[in-house]
Design a protein with these regions (language model features):
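Thiotemplate assembly-line natural product biosynthesis machinery
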Residues: 1-16, 67-77
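Glycine-rich loop motifs involved in handling phospho/adenylate chemistry
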Residues: 20-32, 53-61
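C-terminal structural segments of small proteins and small subunits
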Residues: 52-76
Length: 77
């Protein structure tokens, strides 16, 4: 989780990603941010995020996003 938080903080250091639960809904993460984030996650965590999983509820919080990463990683094993 800390690795993900580091990535998010690099993008928006002013945001408290440990508490924020509406990153997409409140416009903290815009579409370009999400594209960059997906690229970094795929590189750092060695996963591929399927297009069907690129939905706001997976990107509204670091916790939800990390749960998605873990689920994908488990499926790949």
């Amino acid at each position: 989780m800390e690795q993900l938080l580091d990535i998010l903080r690099e993008m928006h250091p002013e945001t408290d990603f440990e508490r924020e639960t509406r990153l997409v809904d409140d416009g903290v993460l815009a579409s370009f941010d999400i594209v960059m984030l997906i690229t970094r996650i795929e590189e750092e965590f060695d996963v591929v995020i399927p297009a069907k999983d690129i939905v706001p509820e997976h990107f509204n919080s670091a916790k939800a996003l990390y749960a998605l990463i873990e689920r994908i990683a488990e499926q790949d094993d």
